Amino acid sequence: MQPLSICYGQIHNLHFTTQIKNNETIVYPKYTYICIVNFAKAKFKRSYGSVEQIIDSKTPEFAFIGRSNVGKSSLINALTSKKDMAKTSAKPGKTQLINFFNVEDQVSLVDLPGYGYAKVSKKLREEFEGLITEYLLRSSNLFIVFVLVDAAIPPQRIDLEFLEWCGVHRVPLGIIFTKTDKKKPKQTEANMLAFEEALSRHFEVQPETFETSASTKYGIETLQQWIELQVDQLHHR
């Protein structure tokens, strides 16, 4: 008999059956691992200025990137239930290193520099855009990069171009719409639909998509559960 499986939040793969007396059939989960990702226990690990510096911890990396001021730090703070886990700034382009946050050696949350910010020197912009490229193409533990898209504004060409670049280079992708509370619902919905329509010209299959608000916490639990599910499945491959 295969052992029971408990996965807090969701139980998966209820396919195993066994026969007992009187020909009764009991359905058991397929495996035993208890998967709980306690995001509130996330801790800052280290900042890196090059991929060569990154210490391989063997934990799956869930990276976050987007245009400057898209709400990336606020999202990471909401995800970890901490006000200052990732440093927020009113000054766009503040994040210029790769910041790692470790969640009990189960998950690495990776805060990547924002792209598309013009008000820094050309040399500095090239340096941290090169850092982004190097990480996305070379990280052996990258599970997915979430591209954050501002739902309060119409589709931005730079977001679509970045997603297309990731698609060409087979970078595993997800999309997180942020700031869904900033405009009236109809306008927000129209912006997201327009973005997805524009994206469909480049992707036959749309990347996994989430809608969030760091202010109201809308969609945060859904994102946490999705990450938890991926970690659970990684343990049972």
Q: What residue spans do the PLM features occupy?
A:
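Conserved G1/Walker A P-loop phosphate-binding module
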Residues: Y28-Y117
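Canonical P-loop GTPase G-domain recognition
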Residues: F39-Y48, K183-R237
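Conserved nucleotide-binding/hydrolysis micro-motifs of P-loop NTPases
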Residues: K94, V107, G114-Y117, A152-P154, ...
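Conserved nucleotide-sensing/catalytic segment adjacent to the nucleotide-binding pocket
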Residues: D105-S140
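Conserved C-terminal guanine-recognition region of P-loop GTPase G domains, centered on the G4
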Residues: E134-Q206
